[in-house]
Swiss-Prot record:
Residue(s) carrying Asymmetric dimethylarginine: 242
Superkingdom to which the source organism belongs: Eukaryota
Positions of post-translational Phosphoserine modification: 188
Protein family per UniProt: Belongs to the quaking family.
Alphabetical UniProt keywords: Cytoplasm, Developmental protein, Differentiation, DNA-binding, Methylation, mRNA processing, mRNA splicing, mRNA transport, Nucleus, Phosphoprotein, RNA-binding, SH3-binding, Translation regulation, Transport, Ubl conjugation
Site (Involved in RNA binding) residue list: 97, 120, 124, 130, 190, 193
GO annotation terms (biological process): axon ensheathment; intracellular mRNA localization; long-chain fatty acid biosynthetic process; microglia differentiation; mRNA processing; mRNA stabilization; mRNA transport; myelination
Designated name of the protein: KH domain-containing RNA-binding protein QKI
High-level lineage: Eukaryota, Metazoa, Chordata, Craniata, Vertebrata
This protein's GO CC annotations: cytoplasm; cytosol; nucleus; synapse
Gene symbol of the encoding locus: Qki
Main location: nucleus
Chain positions of motif Nuclear localization signal: 324-330
GO molecular function, one term: miRNA binding
Region (Qua2 domain): 182-213
Organism: Rattus norvegicus (Rat)
């Protein structure tokens, strides 16, 4: 009908939903221009976070059972202050971290208990401070007398007598549940605290990620699938570290066998005695020095070659008499000498 508001059920208190709420709150607090503007939005977000944490806490401790009604009677009489101490069994369980279990990550568990019961919950006594040096320094000082006592939980409440007694009784029952150590691997409260810490640190993994059980099932399915039997892969020879000796002709055709080599003055070349003429004589070729053997191929042609030599036989440099030794020296030829020019 028109004018009727559609009521929707609250989302289930799941870790994913709590992570989304925490991210929204962190985003709002990181925007300075919006701080203090959306007062109702911030209040509704805080209330939803408290509701989700309360439902998750109740499901963890009470086994997903409906908690008894938290309704309180009307106040009768003046405001009184009540308190009670619950000592922690550290002597029976010396290795158990009761302080971390009661406070929770960043004190969230203790704050949740305070919001539910309406009482103030504090951890006092020896070992209640994280900094042991600071605890020893404060021991014996005013307002630090509790450090001389054993580790305990102090519960205080201020309300009318009839209401204060009910609140204190509920808080004592909830704290006593925390003072009972759970077996390793079966502590649901510890798992919830670790999950909240991961959400606060931003390291919580979404539930949509494939679980290990599913991964194992997929691996088993892959192993059960038929496989194609193939022969062993051939073993390849190791790669050669050096280039093998070429089987074809040499790379430098300009270097040929030396047949005759005569000096300009007519005397035989010194290498002629070492390398005798004949088709069986030749140069020693090293196949692993390619960059050094290719370079002289072009420089050989820069020098004049005697007519008596063959192509490839390097001759000494001949002095040409028709060239000037000095740039300012005048060359006098036979024709000029006869004419006197």
């Amino acid at each position: 009908m028109v004018g009727e508001m559609e009521t929707k059920e609250n989302p289930n208190p799941t870790p994913d939903y709590l992570m989304q709420l925490m991210n929204d709150k962190k985003l709002m607090s990181s925007l300075p221009n919006f701080c203090g503007i959306f007062n109702h939005l911030e209040r509704l977000l805080d209330e939803e976070i408290s509701r989700v944490r309360k439902d998750m806490y109740n499901d963890t401790l009470n086994g997903s059972t409906e908690k008894r009604s938290a309704e309180l009677p009307d106040a009768v009489g003046p405001i009184v202050q009540l308190q009670e101490k619950l000592y922690v069994p550290v002597k029976e369980y010396p290795d158990f971290n009761f302080v971390g279990r009661i406070l929770g990550p960043r004190g969230l568990t203790a704050k949740q208990l305070e919001a539910e019961t309406g009482c103030k919950i504090m951890v006092r006594g020896k070992g209640s401070m994280r900094d042991k040096k600071k605890e020893e320094q404060n021991r014996g000082k005013p307002n630090w007398e509790h450090l001389n006592e054993d580790l305990h939980v102090l519960i205080t409440v201020e309300d009318a007598q009839n209401r204060a007694e009910i609140k204190l009784k509920r808080a004592v029952e909830e704290v006593k549940k925390l003072l009972v150590p759970a077996a390793e691997g079966e502590d649901s409260l510890k798992k919830m605290q670790l999950m909240e810490l991961a959400i606060l640190n931003g390291t919580y993994r979404d539930a949509n990620i494939k679980s290990p059980a599913l991964a194992f099932s997929l691996a088993a399915t892959a192993q059960a699938a038929p496989r194609i039997i193939t022969g062993p892969a051939p073993v390849l020879p190791p790669a050669a570290l050096r280039t093998p000796t070429p089987a074809g002709p040499t790379i430098m055709p300009l270097i040929r066998q030396i047949q005759t080599a005569v000096m300009p003055n007519g005397t035989p070349h010194p290498t002629a005695a070492i390398v005798p003429p004949g088709p069986e004589a030749g140069l020693i070729y090293t196949p692993y020095e390619y960059p050094y053997t290719l370079a002289p191929a072009t420089s050989i042609l820069e020098y004049p070659i005697e007519p008596s030599g063959v192509l490839g036989a390097v001759a000494t440099k001949v002095r040409r008499h028709d060239m000037r030794v000095h740039p300012y020296q005048r060359i006098v030829t036979a024709d000029r000498a006869a004419t006197g020019n």
